[in-house]
Amino acid sequence: MAPKLQISHLGKSFGELQALHDINLAMERGEFIAVVGPSGCGKTTFLRIVAGLEPASSGEVELDGRAVTGPGGDRGFVFQTDNLLPWRTVFANAIIGREVAGRVGPAERRRTLELLKLVGLEGFENYHPRQLSGGMRQRVNLARALAIDPQVLLMDEPFSSLDAQTREIMQTELMRIWEAGRKTVLFVTHQIDEAVFLADRVLVFARRPGRLRESVAIALPRPRTLAIKRTAEFVRYVDHIWRLIEDDVRASVIEEKV
């Protein structure tokens, strides 16, 4: 079976700065892949290229055998920052992708309500973003991305602005939602434990130029609960990935101080 998402010899430069170099990836349908690496290794740039929001300088991205040349409804994007429209209700924010596509009927409205229930927001349909906590707003962002029924879900550090406790709750909620539909997910994070908890594979990026250092298969049983983070096997995965990026992380910290 052909890969759902095929990335071949992907490169990206900004003037003289080479941000990404020769990234190759074959992603299967229903696979959950996380991307980790030090600051400045091009993780977000990589995700934006896959989303069609940023052109590649070299190489190609194919989804179901078709070249990605721009944004499309076959990809849903959950951003790091909260970008809900403050004057729209939870329901109106969640269904906006369907409105843009000109496809809003009874079926789409029912599906949006089902998704809000799936992400734990049943009863909050008529609330506005200012009335919601950070975790609840990210649930709306997730429902909005799922409402267009994307083939691939792209997530750029969606829980980074949340406190530690809320972040762990959102990780378990994302796992529950993913298990229910098995979307193909590409998830960028700085948190190694988050990557190991969520993913089937973790792509470890090296810095400048950003390149794939290692693809780590995570052979932990599913479904996963937070208790798995206390197991020796989980800790071994986290330690292995940390050792892969430790030197680059230290170099990034020193560079930021200069």
Describe each region flagged by the PLM:
Residues F91-A101, R109, A217:
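Short helical segment in ABC ATPase nucleotide-binding domains corresponding to the A-loop/adjacent helical element
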Residues L153-D156:
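Catalytic Walker B motif of ABC-type/P-loop ATPase nucleotide-binding domains
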Residues G59-P71, R111:
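Conserved ABC transporter NBD signature motif
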Residues Y127-R130, I148:
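Conserved signature/switch motifs of ABC ATPase nucleotide-binding domains
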Residues A51:
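Helix-to-loop junction immediately C-terminal to a conserved catalytic motif
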Residues I95, P106-F124, R176:
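Conserved ABC ATPase "signature" region
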Residues V36-P38:
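The feature captures the beta-strand-to-loop junction immediately N-terminal to the Walker
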